[in-house]
Amino acid sequence: MGGLMKKNTVILGIESSCDETAASVVKNGNEIISSVVASQIESHKRFGGVVPEIASRHHVEQITLVIEEALTQANVTMDDLDGIAVTEGPGLVGALLIGVNAAKTLAFMHNLPLIGVHHIAGHIYANRFETEFKFPLLSLVVSGGHTELVLMKADNDFEIIGETRDDAAGEAYDKVARTLGLAYPGGVQIDKLAKEGEDTFHFPRAMMDDGSFDFSFSGLKSSFINTLHNLRQRGEEPNPNDMAASFQASVVDVLVSKTIRAAKKYDVKQLLLAGGVAANQGLRKRLIQEMKLELPDIELIIPPLSLCGDNAAMIAAAGTVSFLQGKRSSYDMNANPGLLLEDI
């Protein structure tokens, strides 16, 4: 590659914020040359959630192998890269450190620019593999740790116009799944059951009509757990499909109604779905239906399932945007579990 004629920007992305160790080579911020993800789901399953200590240990074991595999699959060497992008935060500090230290070491050894990336910016930029962004745009970010409505008027310009005041939607999914005795990760299991059930329990829709774009899922979670507990105390075992469908209907109602209201208010050109819960079939289906009805002129962009969960291609995509804007991180960059999206 190299030389003055070089037109392509080739970035290595590294992601280790939670329980996936991932590396990816991306060209021009929108073409995946390779993407390798080592998942730890099996190791965390018996604990019903991610154990930070176990996650860190897995990252240490996997990080070098995953990076080497990504370079091999892409048929590139370190000399072909223009820079290295890595998730700087938010996430589990011990997990983040593994990726950050690997990226810093490689960047230093090969004299390459280092670009720290916000994990949620990555989820949003996963949509760049689908299409170019048209501003202003709105992203509904739904994951295990985040539920946010993010307005963008330009690349890397993030304004959070709504967020959860307590539990993230993905967190509520996992807790509700545990009370039903479902395996981790719970979101997928609830989604499957919900397809076969009906919304017979009519759980609360918190903050649905309060005028803000904020969310709250702790009341729904409590209502679900109490309903299940009361039924079991009476010797009844409720239909898990209906319980799941009722829970999911409540979450999806709130997410979709607030998103559509925000899209109307801010007169956006595109609506993006982002984050792990973007894989949820119930949410996807409902968003597509409601957008067709309410906002047929706004382009709805939903990432493929392979790019909803944590991956490094999205980090490379977001990193490419920062790289082309001239943003660089210094070699003393550290893992930042409390990194704010609006600060980047």
From Swiss-Prot:
InterPro entries associated with the record: ATPase_NBD, Gcp-like_dom, KAE1/TsaD, Peptidase_M22_CS, TsaD
Q: What's noted on cofactor binding?
A: Binds 1 Fe(2+) ion per subunit.
Which residues does the record give as Fe cation binding sites? H119, H123, D310
Task: Supply the PROSITE patterns for this chain.
Answer: GLYCOPROTEASE
**Cofactor(s) this protein cannot do without:** Fe(2+)
The catalytic activity of this protein is classed by the Enzyme Commission as 2.3.1.234
Provide one Gene Ontology biological process annotation. tRNA threonylcarbamoyladenosine modification
Q: Any one cellular component term from GO for this entry?
A: cytoplasm
Q: Which GO terms describe its molecular function?
A: iron ion binding; N(6)-L-threonylcarbamoyladenine synthase activity
> What Pfam families does the record point to?
TsaD
Q: Which reaction does it catalyse?
A: L-threonylcarbamoyladenylate + adenosine(37) in tRNA = N(6)-L-threonylcarbamoyladenosine(37) in tRNA + AMP + H(+)
The places in or outside the cell where this protein is found are: Cytoplasm
List ligand-binding residues for substrate: V141, V142, S143, G144, G145, D174, G187, D191, N280
Q: Which residues cross the membrane?
A: none
State where it is primarily located: cytoplasm
**Which UniProt key words apply to this protein?**
Acyltransferase, Cytoplasm, Iron, Metal-binding, Transferase, tRNA processing
User: Which NCBIfam families did the record assign?
Assistant: gcp_kae1, T6A_TsaD_YgjD
The UniProt family comment states: Belongs to the KAE1 / TsaD family.
What is its biological role? Answer: Required for the formation of a threonylcarbamoyl group on adenosine at position 37 (t(6)A37) in tRNAs that read codons beginning with adenine. Is involved in the transfer of the threonylcarbamoyl moiety of threonylcarbamoyl-AMP (TC-AMP) to the N6 group of A37, together with TsaE and TsaB. TsaD likely plays a direct catalytic role in this reaction.
What name does this protein carry? tRNA N6-adenosine threonylcarbamoyltransferase
Q: What is the lineage of its organism?
A: Bacteria, Bacillati, Bacillota, Bacilli, Bacillales
